[in-house]
Amino acid sequence: MKRQKRNKDDRAYNRGYNAGLDGKSREDCPFGTLQARTNWMGGWREGRTDFAHGMLGVASIQNLKNIG
């Protein structure tokens, strides 16, 4: 748990990926700093791509980025 809290860039990316995979808008970014927002948007873009390709439910289990 402490290790996850240390790396805020990965955490922002993962939260963005999960938001994109859930089909949420990019306006929902909770981060204000440029670095965290950039990482969140990168994850969101990749999550939206997977969302568009139908990687939902059981199909998204194969993608390890959405775990955590």
UniProtKB/Swiss-Prot annotation:
It is found in: Cytoplasm. It comes from the Bacteria. It holds the Pfam family RMF. GO terms for cellular component: cytoplasm. InterPro entries: Ribosome_modulation_factor, RMF_sf. Its main location: cytoplasm. Keywords: Cytoplasm, Translation regulation. GO terms for biological process: regulation of translation. Gene3D superfamilies: ribosome modulation factor like domain (1.10.10.620). During stationary phase, converts 70S ribosomes to an inactive dimeric form (100S ribosomes). Belongs to the ribosome modulation factor family. This is Ribosome modulation factor. The gene is rmf.
